């Protein structure tokens, strides 16, 4: 496996971990601060959207950088951003992240696109 393939595999494994709610496994793929940050948002977000899923659309790697494009979906079943549960779903919401790999694990993650406007509209929440 090439270094680029290994980096792409890290991002795909990250998505598996998020989808399976295996937050303790984040340390396999991410360095300390990134793993802690992911736990900090995944837990509460999963409380609001228990069936939240990420689908990998594409993963591109070059050098230490990896770009992941994902489609996300979930049903609003818990309070989120002060909004009570609506029971409505968001589907196919685009998210694009740039990751940096260091010593075989994700060392940084930058959200380039998180289409929260589409997510809010599908949930019936005024932006």
Regions found by a protein language model. Name each.
Residues 1-127:
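C-terminal and inter-domain tail/linker signature
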